[in-house]
A protein has these predicted regions:
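Nucleic acid-binding interface residues in structured DNA/RNA-binding domains
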Residues: 1-118
Length: 118
């Protein structure tokens, strides 16, 4: 007898959505939450990403805040690492620590149907 498919957890769905962001593009915590169907869960997206192991294949660095800035503060060099990784993908930050969202922002295709099928 086949087991019924379990719906992916919120955290797993966050990871699946973030994996769709191509190199050189960025998204926001709110954009990820909106792609999952609830833009009010931006903070939970951040928590999910902060739980990733260091050897992950999820491109966490491509998720920034809605002001175009990196949100990590005082986390053992994570902000510097994120900025370095994004820089290697062609994402530049200005003197205020912000990137141009209108240039680099990834607009999701409608992912809800595909994610709900899992």
């Amino acid at each position: 007898m086949d087991k019924p498919k379990r719906k992916a957890s919120f955290t797993q769905r966050v990871y699946e959505v973030v994996k769709t962001v191509p190199p050189g593009a960025i998204t926001t915590y709110g954009d990820v939450a909106a792609a999952l169907g609830n833009p009010r869960l931006a903070r939970q997206v951040g928590w999910a990403l902060s739980a990733l192991p260091s050897d992950t294949d999820v491109p966490w660095q491509r998720v920034i805040n809605s002001k175009g800035a990196i949100s990590f503060r005082g986390e053992c060099g994570r902000a510097e690492e994120q900025r370095r990784l994004l820089g290697s993908e062609g994402v530049e930050f200005n003197e205020h620590g912000r990137c141009e969202l209108e240039v680099h922002r990834w607009w999701y295709p409608d992912l809800r149907e595909a994610l709900d099928a899992d």
